[in-house]
Design a protein with these regions (language model features):
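ATP/nucleoside-binding phosphotransfer catalytic cores, i.e., glycine-rich phosphate-binding loops
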Residues: 281, 285-354
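Bacterial N-terminal signal peptides
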Residues: 9-18
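Accessory alpha-helical/coil subdomains and C-terminal extensions
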Residues: 34, 40, 64-65, 70-75, ...
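Internal gly/pro-rich beta-alpha loop/helix module
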Residues: 146-218
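ATP/NTP phosphate-donor binding region
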Residues: 28-108, 289, 306, 330
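Short Gly/Thr/Asp-enriched flexible loops that form oxyanion-binding sites at enzyme active sites
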Residues: 120-142, 283-292
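Sec-dependent signal peptide cleavage junction
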Residues: 18-29
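Positively charged n-region of N-terminal signal peptides that target proteins for export
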Residues: 1-8
Length: 354
């Protein structure tokens, strides 16, 4: 009997030790990342201030990077943070010069072994464009994550603090290494190439069409299920170091009775054109005649959100298909292509691979 009691007591003590170990392992916050996350602030709604409780009529880009971080003290438990105020603007005022500054800053700071990743706070209107530009121009496998918000900081139930927290979690996660530039929004992780803003008001304003998100964040834990397959970051051939501007590319949108003379005007004032055609990149006969006469690179995209434009289905012989890129992302790739060889053969290759 005595041996039996001793055995039971020993078993109970062992179970208590196991239970205690499990609590310490799973019940405590994740260990703080040993590296540093650089938060690059550019403004946008996430830094917006307006009438208390309201979601409209606010001033974007009013709060600083330090203000945003101070509102989420839990971020300090994730990693050491360095804040950099790149600019403080509405994202509709983002320029190629700001893009180049972001790329230069990331490429320079990524060489610091203490830096583990980057978060860019940004307005949602043009977030997808900045993300794709950086996806093609930053030269690091370290995570680069964009985030923002649909509600200003002064609104009821502002979404910015959680989005910023989750973006830092992703930037500090090994799961995000080598995945290219990402967007983190409303618990979801999106690849830069496929992410797009799809709502003017919904806090779940980002989506990725037919491909969907590549992962999620849950209570600070990062789950990445897909790896982007198109060329990006360290494998990209584009080098923007030393550039202070980019070639000019205009986007034209075809519709019923759209004036074809707009094509001539745009061509005279641009280095290249992207045309958002109807359906699978189609136009009226009047547009086709003028497009065929243009002597600058022309990329054909679509007004449609999903689907692919292929070179064997183009109506104009001197154009190149955008594949699955939206008009605005096709314009970014064309602008970068125009910094080098912009032959039709090279453009076809780029739009298939990037």
């Amino acid at each position: 009997m005595k041996k039996h009691v001793i055995f039971l007591l020993s078993l109970l003590m062992a179970l208590c030790c196991i239970f205690s170990a499990a609590i310490s392992e799973n019940g405590e916050p994740a260990a703080r990342h040993p590296g540093k996350i650089v938060v690059l602030a550019t403004g946008g709604t996430i830094a917006g201030v307006g009438e208390a409780g309201k979601t409209t009529g606010y001033k974007p880009g009013a709060l600083t990077a330090e203000d945003l971080l101070a509102a989420v003290p839990e971020i300090a438990d994730v990693a050491e943070i360095e804040a950099v105020q790149v600019c403080n603007v509405n994202s509709d005022d983002i320029t190629a010069e700001i893009w180049l500054t972001l790329a230069e800053t990331i490429n320079r700071m990524a060489g610091d072994p203490e830096v583990a990743g980057f978060v860019i706070t940004h307005g949602t209107d043009t977030m997808e464009e900045t993300a794709y530009f950086l996806n093609l121009t930053v030269k690091t496998d370290k995570p680069v994550v964009l985030t923002g918000s649909m509600r200003p900081a002064t609104s009821l139930s502002a979404d910015g603090p959680m989005n910023l927290y989750e973006a830092v979690c992703v930037a500090a996660s090994e799961e995000a290494v080598g995945k290219g530039v990402l967007i983190v929004f409303a618990d979801r992780i999106y690849a830069a190439r496929t992410a797009a803003k799809t709502s003017t008001y919904n806090i779940m304003a980002l989506a990725a069409g037919e491909t969907g998100s590549i992962g999620m964040v849950r209570d600070g834990t990062v789950y990445v299920y897909e790896t982007p397959s198109r060329i990006h970051t360290t494998a990209s051939e584009f080098d923007v170091s030393g550039l202070t501007s980019l070639p000019k590319v205009s986007i034209l949108y075809f519709s019923v009775d759209a004036d074809p003379e707009l094509l001539r005007y745009a061509a005279e004032h641009s280095d290249g054109l992207v045309i958002a055609g109807a359906g699978a990149g189609e136009f009226s006969e009047k547009w086709i005649d003028i497009i065929n006469s243009l002597e600058i690179p022309v990329i054909i995209s679509s007004r449609i959100n999903d689907g692919v434009i292929t070179n064997d289905n183009l109506l104009c012989g001197n154009t190149v298909a955008a594949n699955t890129l939206s008009p605005q992302k096709a314009a970014i790739l064309l602008r970068l292509a125009l910094t080098g060889d912009a032959s039709r053969e090279r453009l076809e290759k780029l739009f298939l691979e990037y």
